[in-house]
């Protein structure tokens, strides 16, 4: 027994310091692979934190990472910060430091598509940076050295999110309550699948909105982070998907109180989607 215990401690010591062992194992066998859930603002993540009974906080690079469990899954919740640079830093930390096995972004966005309205949900199948332009060296929107302008969402994750979003919209009176639905005029919100675009500016004028609609007619919604996450996840071969709640039409006609919408609608959407999604997944 003493020899066996000594051998085990010996192995652990070597794993800790990343030295090759005599047993056929690698460091990754001893490293957990949590699921990361990300939002840009605290209001989008607040309801999720309430669902995790055992969360504890770790701070890295000025960010608070909340580690815990939900439906048997190890989960990390984090605010990415607003904008593509902040998003890229957060994505890299999740992968390099926390060894995230997959990343899902939940939050709000401005609607661009013709029939994309306030209260609708958009599950992205692809991502593009609408403010990336290195022409004439490369075609507009193309990411230098990659030869592409869009990065794809993980098909399996996107499909799972679609299924859950359909259920959430069907149960909306229970998720939000009739009072919130009435207050924000949410009658029959729809689910959309398609292109999500990101850029380092808050699109809030009709002129900007129309320009994006003209240049990128296939875009369903616009925000400021997901395309950066998609590129980093592509680099590391980590599955990524995003679901966005439409908070406005990204133009001059926005009449919704954003903070109220965030607390009474978007945060409940995010919590319900993630809760139902993880409850359906088999815990590893």
Language-model features, listed with the residues they occupy:
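Mid-sequence, gly/pro-rich, charge-dense loop/helix-turn segments that line enzyme active sites
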Residues: 113-216
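Intrinsic-disorder-associated, low-complexity terminal segments enriched in Asp/Asn/His/Tyr and depleted
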Residues: 3, 7, 13, 17-18
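Structural motif
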Residues: 102-104
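A C-terminal functional module that forms or caps the active site or interfaces directly
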Residues: 199-251
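Glycine-rich phosphate-binding loop signature in dinucleotide/nucleotide-binding domains
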Residues: 96-99, 236-238
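N-terminal short beta-loop-beta anion/metal-coordinating cradle
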Residues: 26-92, 98
